[in-house]
Amino acid sequence: MPKRTDIKSVMVIGSGPIVIGQAAEFDYSGTQACRVLREEGVRVILVNSNPATIMTDPEMADATYIDPISTPILEKIIAKERPDALLPTLGGQTALNAAVALGEAGVLKKYNVELIGASLEAIDRGEDRESFKKVVKEAGAESARSDIAHTLEEVDAIAERFGFPLVVRPSFTMGGLGSGIAHDTEELHRIAGAGIHYSPTDEVLIEEGIEGWKEYELELMRDRNDNVVVVCPIENVDPVGVHTGDSITVAPVFTLTDREYQKLRDIGIAIIRGVGVDTGGCNIQFAIHPDTGRIIVIEMNPRVSRSSALASKATGFPIAKIATKLALGYTLDEIQNDITRSTPASFEPTIDYVVTKVPRFAFEKFPGADPTLTTSMKSVGEAMALAGNFQESLGKAMRSIDKRHMGFSWDGEKPSEGEVHELLEQMRIPTEHRYLQVMRAIWGGATPEQIFNATKIDPWFIDQFFQINATAMQVRGAETLSKRLLRKAKLAGLSDVQIAHLRRLGDEGENTIRELRWNYGLHPVFKTVDTCAAEFAAQTPYYYSCYADETELRKREREAVIILGSGPNRIGQGIEFDYTCVHAVQELGKDYDTIMVNCNPETVSTDYDMSDRLYFEPLTFEDVLEIYEAEKKQGPIKGVIVQLGGQTPLSLAARLKAAGVPILGTTPEAIDLAENRELFGEVLRQEHLNAPRFGTALSLEEAREAAHNIGYPVLVRPSYVLGGRGMEIVYDDAQLETYVNRALSEAKADTVVSGRLPSPLLIDKFLQDAIEIDVDALFDGEELYIGGIMEHIEEAGVHSGDAACTLPPSTLSDDQIRRLREATLAIAKGCQVRGLMNVQYAFMANTLYVIEANPRASRTVPFASKATGVALAKAAARIMAGETIEQQRENGLLLPYGDGGDVRLGQQVAVKESVLPFKRFRTPVGKTVDILLGPEMRSTGEVMGFDRDFPHAFAKSQLASYEGGLPTNGNVFISVNDTDKRQLPLFAVRLVELGFEIWATEGTASVLRRYGIESKIVDKIHSRVDTDPEHPIEIQHAAGSVGKNVVELIEEGQIDLILNTPNSRGSRSDGYSIRAAAIAADIPQYTTMTEFSAVLLAIEAVKKNDYEVMSIQEHSRELYELERKHKEEGEEARAQ
């Protein structure tokens, strides 16, 4: 069937901010969709609140709205743009739920907008638990015994019938949010209560526990002629009980018989037909009992999912692209396979290699969080590897995770019998360390049966782990490392670093092993991903390495640039860095062959048709050097870009240069100059720039001396970190001692000598009550171009990645902006930057302080680019390749005059707000972890509010980050520290004028009473040990109080807004319980007075309900017009 001709314009809804369970994979799928629609001549209207996405680039759609994905805003855009159809299946659960809400509100009918990709009925049958159970039954398959509940009373009744353990699964949520496994009534109430809250339909499915069963997934696609293909089967190494996003997964499947696999196919095809997905794809999850073979259907997603992105990258079959074509009316047999260009999409992909995905976690960012892996997803990113066998693929994937333990470790002494027993007990509870525990137990003598009984991991995988250990022991014990043994080690997935450790070769061991390997002529070869197990020739150069005989690399003629990506998403290094890499690829591809190296299956950069060559490889020194050596033989290489992918590639710069690899842009020496505190301090002194007083320390004594010289409070952090890892504000000697002792315990044991750390701690004076500013800039060696000046809405002390900020700045004077510009130019020259740089400043009492400079792309580059209409990363890539800023003005990449530091009258305002994952992380007794923000970054994503002035833009940013946005009336709870009480009366008067009733603790209420402001008194909470069930919360009744504390009032739904500024040690104060309860109830809460002043302005804007919706294409034209007028006015003034 040919494409439908009645669809002229389509609205695509994105997935919004990066959150756990819904990450960069939807930027990948959304970008694919937009490209397909435009290629087909369809006008594209895109809505997404996340500026750090390629899909929100102006060239991806005809009209791009970086606005909240809420029904009122979406209706405004639909009314303005009048699309023929809405495509919601490529924006995750957010887009699907938004489409359902638009349908229920009558908006789709009112404006005659057709839903394509999936009907409302199909969405309901796939997402609603009860409806889906019926579909499964009609398909002749089995679900786990279960029942639906909407209240805790109904939950208890089901528990009485089924007994424990029970699985709770909410309807219409993603990433298993609100789900969990309950082993008793208390756990059941906690999990089910959260599930009912997070489900938009207040519905949970309670099902019998099937922990320990084997788990599989199928990715399927179906067209309107009822053709169905199974794109990829995926096997979870972890058994049922661990969310598939937190499990190691592999393709193809290894532990199914052909008969079992065919049974899963038959069930999957019957279900996709029964649900009614007839123009797109879906993901179905199954469980199989390891002994009886009983098959249970767990759930399905009637949309492109996280697993779809993994399956696409694993097979080379672009699911999102094909789903979009199916939504336009094509059938599978009419769509060409891009990789072979000779087979249709109705040919099911076949793979002759092994794909392994390993999750990346960030528990270290959330002290007190329960590290147990359950049915609610907790990983923040993932890495994928391809190789010739499972062992090699697993080894590559584990070192791609980029953590301190790069895969399995056999360091130290062989575990004793007692330690093995302890390890077997520990691995019964799944955590991120389970596989390291398994390998250590095997090394210590555990049997396969013991490992299986403790983990329920399939015996086939356990046997693979035993084989890896056996190879490691051969390497460890051999007198000499023969070529044959070294090759065997490589086929077992062991890196040069691991082999060096096994051989006890010390610091230079990796280089020693590499030299030996190269002397033996042992190099990996590079194979092509072709979708068909080499049955047809692949036209797309999409490569992976393995230790085999024949390489499939082809010669090239053009000079090449290698761009190193950022690896798996993690807090502090996320999608923003992939955005800059993709821009570099797009721009440099005009003049060079672009070679992308990355290992993240979620990203746009690992789309096989984004770069000229794609290497799906770990970002380690060994793997990158092998790619460089292989590519050098295929054609000329201009150099490698390490500046755009964050700290991971940046940390390789010096070693790559030492190995003879040319580095483009800022040199490794200049990178070290900016990162080294003493050297950078000298640059600042020469340029007469202020910095907070600082010192460095390798021991507790040195740290104490530095802190006393500087004066408390101080900011303490390790050197060379991203995302404020390990950063803390310290107020006294006791807190400092705790910090240093923790740093010593976390350092590798063999690097700590006599209580001294291997690398110094940095200790800075903490600037209280200062305004913090981020500046992104380009420098070509002569000229500076300011990309954007972003003023933080919170005062200094909150990590820049977590802080809300505004562009243009809202309170800085022209003189302050001039001083920022001059300081940035001086630092760029002093650090010899070439390309992008980011400098963080603070104004305290109008004195400018330099906090730090980063000679690389920062996480604010996408936001600054969208707010100013300038593709900063594209211009930076050309500057790194040797061009000038003047050339970028001439070719249209940069503004022809002026830059992002100029503030124009009438300019639209952009506000960036962070999105935090706290509702995912709970303590072992079920409380959410503390949300109090500080110098260590904890956000996973961001949103952008964009409107005519700051109040409206900030209000949009809150609407995009809080479900429902800011309240316009109701009850506001206030509890502020003594320092903030002087500002409080003005805030309180405004709240009363806006129609709020104030509820406050006794101390705050008495301050308000002195100013004639009435408030309801709420009991205070005293929590001795928040996470200890032996010490429950005690309540102290205040005179004249309502008789309840604020936590009870929040749980009863009586509080609509919270202002809670903690004291200097906030995280252990009463505030913790308040903040934890507010997260669970999804109530907007603010912990600084400066941000709350912005909230008051925003509430006024919300009450007016006169938001503007402006596409970024319109905004860009407006900015250029403002710049032109400004230039003309300047020329006229000079002429006079």
Curated annotation (Swiss-Prot):
Catalytic reaction annotation: hydrogencarbonate + L-glutamine + 2 ATP + H2O = carbamoyl phosphate + L-glutamate + 2 ADP + phosphate + 2 H(+)
Annotated residues for binding of Mn(2+) 1: Q285, E299
Residue ranges constituting the ATP-grasp domain according to the UniProt record: 133-328, 681-881
Binding site for Mn(2+) 2: E299, N301
Amino-acid positions noted as binding ATP 2 in the UniProt annotation, renumbered to this chain: R717, K765, L767, E772, G797, V798, H799, S800, Q840, E852
Enzyme nomenclature, EC number: 6.3.4.16, 6.3.5.5
Positions of the UniProt region annotated as Carbamoyl phosphate synthetic domain: 552-962
GO terms under cellular component: cytoplasm
Gene Ontology molecular function: any one: carbamoyl-phosphate synthase (glutamine-hydrolyzing) activity
Binding site for Mg(2+) 1: Q285, E299
Amino acids binding Mg(2+) 2: E299, N301
Pathway listed: Amino-acid biosynthesis; L-arginine biosynthesis; carbamoyl phosphate from bicarbonate: step 1/1; Pyrimidine metabolism; UMP biosynthesis via de novo pathway; (S)-dihydroorotate from bicarbonate: step 1/3
Subunit and interaction comment: Composed of two chains; the small (or glutamine) chain promotes the hydrolysis of glutamine to ammonia, which is used by the large (or ammonia) chain to synthesize carbamoyl phosphate. Tetramer of heterodimers (alpha,beta)4.
Domains as described in the record: The large subunit is composed of 2 ATP-grasp domains that are involved in binding the 2 ATP molecules needed for carbamoyl phosphate synthesis. The N-terminal ATP-grasp domain (referred to as the carboxyphosphate synthetic component) catalyzes the ATP-dependent phosphorylation of hydrogencarbonate to carboxyphosphate and the subsequent nucleophilic attack by ammonia to form a carbamate intermediate.
Function noted in UniProt: Large subunit of the glutamine-dependent carbamoyl phosphate synthetase (CPSase). CPSase catalyzes the formation of carbamoyl phosphate from the ammonia moiety of glutamine, carbonate, and phosphate donated by ATP, constituting the first step of 2 biosynthetic pathways, one leading to arginine and/or urea and the other to pyrimidine nucleotides.
Protein name listed in UniProt: Carbamoyl phosphate synthase large chain
Protein's organism: Bifidobacterium animalis subsp. lactis (strain AD011)
